[in-house]
Swiss-Prot record:
The keyword Transit peptide does not apply. The active site is at D82 (proton donor). The gene is gatY. This is D-tagatose-1,6-bisphosphate aldolase subunit GatY. Its cofactor is Zn(2+). Pathway: Carbohydrate metabolism; D-tagatose 6-phosphate degradation; D-glyceraldehyde 3-phosphate and glycerone phosphate from D-tagatose 6-phosphate: step 2/2. It comes from Shigella boydii serotype 4 (strain Sb227). Belongs to the class II fructose-bisphosphate aldolase family. TagBP aldolase GatY subfamily. GO terms for molecular function: tagatose-bisphosphate aldolase activity; zinc ion binding.
């Protein structure tokens, strides 16, 4: 097994009526939990990293780790650039071996978004790299980027078709009421908008900001065309809360291999639940 593109993963999900979870990883323990759990459940998963994650860990290190774990567990894995904005940064990582990219130019006016995305698509497709882009903009914070709720806006279904056709993207991230981070109360997702987008666009659709969504809402979005579910904050929260609890109960603890086990156990529960919600167990 080896590092693969997300294109076939998401096309399979679109045909099969399930979604592939993309887990944002932040350290070795997160990677171990995601891959081990996915392999045990025979579920396809995507290892995602923001620019900050790649800077923290190093592109070559992440690629080597994903490749080694794919071979160790005999499980296909995709490593994905999440919310990358700079062409030169994307190009460098693609040349290093990354095979899945999200170019996020959603903050730009429509025409400029198309232009920026098409530049990335034209480059990436030369290397058989799949490209995701976003139309509409989610509120909340992702990496170092903060989008105020007032500046967030939903995806326009008619524009979505024009955007997809003009850019040649392989998947489309949509804005239907989710946000980055956890929710103080359950969000009201615009399912009718999602259904309209699917009628206009015959591409795998992507849902960002899925941390904290109910199983019912996740499964409804999948019925309406979502093929990739992004989860980041829920993993971070599980990790940090379990770690805090352990160190509070065991203030004398100094061995990382001991106290990190509680954090891994908490994350394992999250990963298992997300895989179940996505309906992708046994699909790898």
């Amino acid at each position: 097994m080896h590092v693969v593109s997300t294109k076939q993963m998401l096309n399979n999900a679109q045909r099969g009526g399930y979604a592939v979870p993309a887990f944002n990883i932040h350290n070795l323990e997160t990677m171990q939990v995601v891959v081990e759990t996915a392999a045990n459940l025979h579920a396809p998963v995507i290892i995602a990293g923001t620019p900050g994650t790649f800077t923290h860990a190093g592109t070559e290190n992440l690629l080597a780790l994903v490749s080694a774990m794919a071979k160790q567990y005999h499980h296909p894995l995709a490593i994905h650039l999440d919310h990358h904005t700079k062409f030169d940064d994307i190009a460098q990582k693609v040349r290093s071996g990354v095979r899945s990219v999200m170019i996020d130019a959603s903050h730009l006016p429509f025409a400029q978004n198309i232009s920026r995305v098409k530049e990335v698509v034209d480059f990436c497709h030369r290397f058989d790299v799949s490209v995701e882009a976003e139309l509409g903009q989610l509120g909340g914070q992702e990496d170092d980027v903060q989008v105020n709720e007032a500046d967030a806006f939903y995806t326009n279904p008619a524009q979505a078709r024009e955007f997809a056709e003009a850019t040649g993207i392989d998947s489309l991230a949509v804005a239907i009421g989710t946000a980055h981070g956890m929710y103080a109360s359950a969000p009201a997702l615009d399912f009718s908008r999602l259904e309209n987008i699917r009628q206009w666009v015959n591409l795998p659709l992507v849902l960002h900001g899925a941390s904290g969504l109910s199983t019912k809402d996740i499964q409804q979005t999948i019925k309406l065309g979502i093929c990739k579910i992004n989860v980041a904050t829920e993993l971070k929260n599980a990790f940090s809360q379990a770690l805090k609890n352990y160190l509070t109960e065991h203030p004398e603890a100094t061995e990382p291999r001991d106290y990190l086990q509680s954090a891994k156990s908490a994350m394992r529960d999250v990963v298992s639940k997300v895989i179940a919600d996505c309906g992708c167990e046994g699909r790898a």
